[in-house]
């Protein structure tokens, strides 16, 4: 899939889990398929780039003529802004965790599996560097947040490859380079580990740690923030801040399964299950939203473990 963002010409997402499962754990075949999919992504990105060429600045004067992104003349095209680092064109990726587990049988936090995961990242960076040199277009590697697409991708994987424990057995796949949300690891080790992968994701990356209510433990918050400052480029703390409009409960609204196996939200105090009468705040993909999510993302939220 592709999309346009301000300050970015285009994104294309690469599903690493599909590449791994398609290889049947044959490492040589994995890299062969990997390069084939990379070239397909390259073609899609170039299609988006070429589609933008010739666009007149008049389509968005605030952006292109009045200084938000540039000061072009009326009738002038945006072509020159698509080259030489003025805008980025992003190769996205997701599911490094599941990809590594399928190919190695281990989490990418395992010392025996980490070199493979890093090689995958380096390989994509090398492809971006090659395309950049050839075209003078600023290709860059971008850690895909997936948002609601995580559910669609996981369902497609299940249809294609069946249920593979630790790989396709969830209704979500892990964002970008992240450690799996169910893996027990403390906040400091998680941030230090993921910092190695952020360095290889220059087009965009963010890490998270899950924490309980920290109002009475400010020293711990400051310790984590200092660790972030000293060790990683960009990271955030996730906490839970919910409110039930029926009984006034403030805390964590629970995710439970109904009689049909569907995940729903329920107030642990009064049993309220009406989403219109509760405020649930959870971070998804960089944003703390109060909307509700599809079944895949909801399962991912439910299964997040605490890191403090």
Stretches found by the model and what they are:
Residues 2-9, 13:
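Single conserved hydrophobic/aromatic residue that forms the stacking wall/gate
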Residues 20-32, 102-114:
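Inter-helical turn/loop segments and adjacent helix faces that build the functional surface
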Residues 35, 109-128, 298-308:
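Short secondary-structure subsegments characteristic of cysteine-rich extracellular domains
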Residues 44-65, 111-113, 128-142, 235-240:
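Flexible, glycine/charged-enriched surface loops at secondary-structure junctions
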Residues 54-75, 121, 137-152, 242-251, ...:
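A glycine-rich phosphate-binding loop feature that marks nucleotide/adenosyl-phosphate handling sites
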Residues 146-151, 157-255:
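Catalytic alpha/beta core of large soluble enzyme barrels
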Residues 258-272:
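Cysteine-rich micro-motifs
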Residues 269-308:
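Long insertion/accessory domains within large nucleic-acid-processing enzymes
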């Amino acid at each position: 899939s592709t999309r346009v963002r301000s300050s970015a010409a285009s994104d294309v997402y690469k599903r690493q889990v599909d590449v791994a499962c398609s290889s049947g754990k044959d490492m040589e075949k994995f890299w062969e398929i990997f390069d084939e999919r990379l070239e397909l992504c390259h073609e899609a990105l170039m299609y988006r780039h070429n589609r933008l060429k010739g666009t007149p600045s008049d389509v968005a004067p605030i952006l292109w003529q009045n200084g938000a992104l540039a000061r072009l003349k009326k009738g002038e095209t945006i072509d020159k802004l698509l080259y030489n680092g003025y805008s980025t064109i992003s190769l996205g990726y997701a599911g490094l965790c599941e990809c590594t587990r399928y190919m190695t049988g281990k989490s990418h936090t395992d010392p025996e599996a980490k070199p493979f995961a890093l090689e995958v990242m380096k390989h994509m960076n090398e492809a971006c560097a090659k395309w950049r040199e050839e075209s003078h277009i600023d290709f860059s590697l971008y850690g895909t947040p997936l948002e609601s697409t995580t559910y669609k991708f996981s369902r497609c994987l299940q249809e294609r490859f069946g249920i593979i424990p630790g790989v396709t057995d969830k209704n979500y796949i892990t964002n970008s380079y992240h450690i799996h949300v169910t893996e027990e690891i403390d906040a400091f080790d998680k941030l230090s580990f993921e910092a190695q992968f952020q360095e290889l994701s220059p087009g965009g990356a963010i890490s998270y740690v899950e924490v309980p209510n920290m109002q009475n433990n400010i020293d711990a918050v400051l310790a984590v923030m200092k660790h972030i400052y000293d060790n990683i480029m960009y990271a955030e703390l996730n906490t839970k801040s919910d409110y039930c409009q029926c009984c006034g409960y403030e805390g964590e609204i629970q995710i439970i399964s109904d009689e049909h196996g569907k995940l729903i939200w329920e107030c642990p105090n009064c049993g309220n299950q009406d989403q219109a009468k509760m405020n649930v705040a959870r971070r998804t993909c960089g944003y703390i939203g109060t909307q509700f999510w599809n079944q895949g993302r909801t399962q991912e939220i439910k299964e997040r473990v605490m890191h403090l």
